[in-house]
Structures are given as structure tokens and as C-alpha cells.
């Protein structure tokens, strides 16, 4: 029986230089690879994935709250609210070395509509370097009394671990957004995509054909319209297999391509254009060079 999993989104917000990146990096620890350039949407930018046991947090950035001064003009910007409204928790970071500034007030105002909808954790950071942390914290808390205050240093492992545990506990039940080993593996994004393509191809092929299939991603490009363009090759060993993979009227390859695209779009949360080609690579399974080229680094023989 499958064990229950818990997963959700957490936004880390706050004015510049308060320590958001430091905190995020230390929450993620060594296990997680930052995935910044890939899954970008206009509303949210993924900053990292944390998976611990059966719990997963996808940390997101909220463009618009990053530089609150810029957001002043369009303060009621619906997009900011929408981006924040569907996260499972907000971490609002402030700098305890100083009292609040107008920029902090702007962040507080932007968060106000979320009160009662999403837990807001007010993290007073740089506790190690603050002279009057209690006073500062009190002033920040007054900007948004509904937020749950805590003081820490993003550089303190134990304090960050406590915050991490609390955030993980806030995640609702649900399937992981990313494969469990995704963030931990040293796979490149292309290798990860190639594996998903191979999985979808194998599901739809019979007899010896599935094992003759290898996949490779040749190009990944972020298009201006927000679509992720992916060029991938599906290799087989013989022309007869190529015909099977393509299928009558190209039906089989279309099916494989669509399933792959759908899975990628669901995992990445963005539109994908998959440019898929079938090529014959004679006896690639017996060719050490081919194996290396196709990413089977050590599994010759
Ligand atoms: N003493 C101390 N310094 C910290 C702490 N957390 C972060 N810093 C320092 O504060 C500075 C800003 O940290 P960042 O993590 O870059 O801040 P940020 O909020 O991500 O900044 P932006 O990317 O400009 O929004 C860096 O020099 C950090 O080393 C802390 O807990 N204690």
C-alpha cells in the first residue's frame, strides 16, 4: 500500500538584503539542486525543492514582492495576490538589526489579504547580529499582527532546521510535484526529460522494441512566449523498429510525444513544445561509445 505523502508550495518574501537567499539555501541544504533557469512562469519562479521523507516543499519566488518599491505603482496587482494565494505558507523575512522601513510596510500590506487563508510566518533574521532584536521584532509584528513571529539567524543550522520542520509539517496531503530523487540526483535537466520520454515510450511498445529504445535531449530553450522548447531524439537499433515506433500514419510516436509533453507540463507547471525525432543508431546497445553518448556512463557490459 502506498504511504501518504504531503507536498505544497512555500513563498519566501521580503525586501532586498534581509537574507532570503541565505535562508533558502540553508533550508535546502546540500541535498537539493537549485533549478532556477528551468521552470519559470510569469507568476511564480521555482527556487528549489526540498524533499524529506514523505514530505516535499517547492519554494517559489513571487515576482512583484521581490522589489516592493517597484510594486508600489501596481500595488493592487492581481498577479501578486494570485501567486501568493495558492501557496501553502508564506515566509516573510525581515532584518532584526534594524526597525521596519517603508519597504517592509509595503510587504506587510501585500500580505494582508492572505491573512486567514495562508499561514504567514514572520521570520526575524540576523538574530546573531542584532542589538535590539526584541524591539525590532515587536515593531515588525505590529505591521501584521496575524503573522506568526519567530527570531533566528539564517546562518544557524539548528534554528533553520526548526523552521524547516515547521514548514514541512504545514504541507497538506498530496502527491509530490517532483520525483522524489529529482532534486537529490545529479541528473541534468536534459537527462531527466530523456528518462520521462523513455518511460512513456516503453509503456507503449511491445516485444523487444522497448529495450532497443534510447532517448536523448538535444536542446532545451525557454521561448519568449513562456513555452519550454525541447528537442529530443528517440533512438532504436534497426529500421524495422523505427517503423514500429513511428506507427501507422505516425500515430504511435504522436502518442508517445503527447504523453511525455503532458507529464512534463504537469511536473513543470508550464507549457512544453516537444520536438521529437526517431533515428536509427545501429546496435547502440553493443557500442561503448554509443552507450556513453546516450548517457549510460558506466553500464557497458
Ligand atoms: N549576520 C547575519 N548575516 C546574514 C544572515 N542572513 C543573511 N545574512 C547576510 O545578509 C546579506 C544578504 O543576504 P541575502 O541572502 O543575499 O539576502 P536576500 O534577501 O536574498 O537579498 P536579495 O537577493 O537582494 O533580495 C548577505 O551578506 C548575507 O550573508 C544572518 O542570519 N546573520
Curated annotation (Swiss-Prot):
It comes from the Bacteria. The keyword Nucleotide-binding applies. GTP binds at residues 14-21, 61-65, 125-128. SUPFAM superfamilies: P-loop containing nucleoside triphosphate hydrolases (SSF52540), Prokaryotic type KH domain (KH-domain type II) (SSF54814). Residues 40-44 are annotated as: G2. The keyword Ion transport does not apply. Residues 152-154 are annotated as: G5. Keywords: Cell inner membrane, Cell membrane, Cytoplasm, GTP-binding, Membrane, Nucleotide-binding, Ribosome biogenesis, RNA-binding, rRNA-binding. It is a peripheral membrane protein. Residues 14-21 are annotated as: G1. GO terms for molecular function: GTP binding; GTPase activity; ribosomal small subunit binding; small ribosomal subunit rRNA binding. One of its GO terms (cellular component) is cytosol. Belongs to the TRAFAC class TrmE-Era-EngA-EngB-Septin-like GTPase superfamily. Era GTPase family. An essential GTPase that binds both GDP and GTP, with rapid nucleotide exchange. Plays a role in 16S rRNA processing and 30S ribosomal subunit biogenesis and possibly also in cell cycle regulation and energy metabolism. Monomer. Binds to the 30S ribosomal subunit, between the head and platform, contacting the 16S rRNA. Contacts ribosomal proteins S7 and S18 and may contact proteins S2 and S11. This is GTPase Era. It comes from Thermus thermophilus (strain ATCC 27634 / DSM 579 / HB8). The lineage of its organism: Bacteria, Thermotogati, Deinococcota, Deinococci, Thermales. The gene is era.
Amino acid at each position: 500500500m502506498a504511504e501518504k505523502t504531503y507536498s505544497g508550495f512555500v513563498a519566501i518574501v521580503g525586501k532586498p538584503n534581509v537574507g532570503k537567499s541565505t535562508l533558502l539555501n540553508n533550508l535546502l541544504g546540500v541535498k537539493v539542486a537549485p533549478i532556477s533557469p528551468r521552470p519559470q512562469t510569469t507568476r511564480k519562479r521555482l527556487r528549489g525543492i526540498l524533499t524529506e521523507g514523505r514530505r516535499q516543499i517547492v519554494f517559489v519566488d513571487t515576482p512583484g514582492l521581490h522589489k516592493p518599491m517597484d510594486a508600489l505603482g501596481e500595488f493592487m496587482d492581481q498577479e501578486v495576490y494570485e501567486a501568493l494565494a495558492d501557496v501553502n505558507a508564506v515566509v516573510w523575512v525581515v532584518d532584526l538589526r534594524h526597525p521596519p522601513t517603508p519597504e517592509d510596510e509595503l510587504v506587510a500590506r501585500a500580505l494582508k489579504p492572505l491573512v486567514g487563508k495562508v499561514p504567514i510566518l514572520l521570520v526575524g533574521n540576523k538574530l546573531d547580529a542584532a542589538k535590539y532584536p526584541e524591539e525590532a521584532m515587536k515593531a515588525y509584528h505590529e505591521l501584521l499582527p496575524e503573522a506568526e513571529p519567530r527570531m533566528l539567524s539564517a546562518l544557524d543550522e539548528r534554528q533553520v532546521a526548526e523552521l524547516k520542520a515547521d514548514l514541512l509539517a504545514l504541507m497538506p496531503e498530496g502527491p509530490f510535484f517532483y520525483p522524489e530523487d529529482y532534486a537529490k540526483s545529479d541528473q541534468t535537466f536534459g537527462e531527466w526529460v530523456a528518462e520521462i520520454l523513455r518511460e512513456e515510450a516503453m509503456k507503449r511498445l511491445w516485444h523487444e522494441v522497448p529495450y532497443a529504445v534510447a532517448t536523448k535531449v538535444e536542446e532545451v530553450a525557454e521561448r519568449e512566449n513562456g513555452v519550454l522548447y525541447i528537442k529530443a531524439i528517440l533512438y532504436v537499433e534497426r529500421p524495422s523498429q523505427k517503423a514500429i515506433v513511428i506507427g501507422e500514419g505516425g500515430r504511435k510516436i504522436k502518442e508517445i510525444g503527447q504523453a511525455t509533453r503532458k507529464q512534463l507540463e504537469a511536473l513543470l507547471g508550464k507549457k512544453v513544445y516537444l520536438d521529437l525525432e526517431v533515428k536509427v543508431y545501429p546496435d547502440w546497445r553493443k557500442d561503448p561509445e554509443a552507450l556513453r553518448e546516450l548517457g549510460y556512463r558506466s553500464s557497458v557490459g
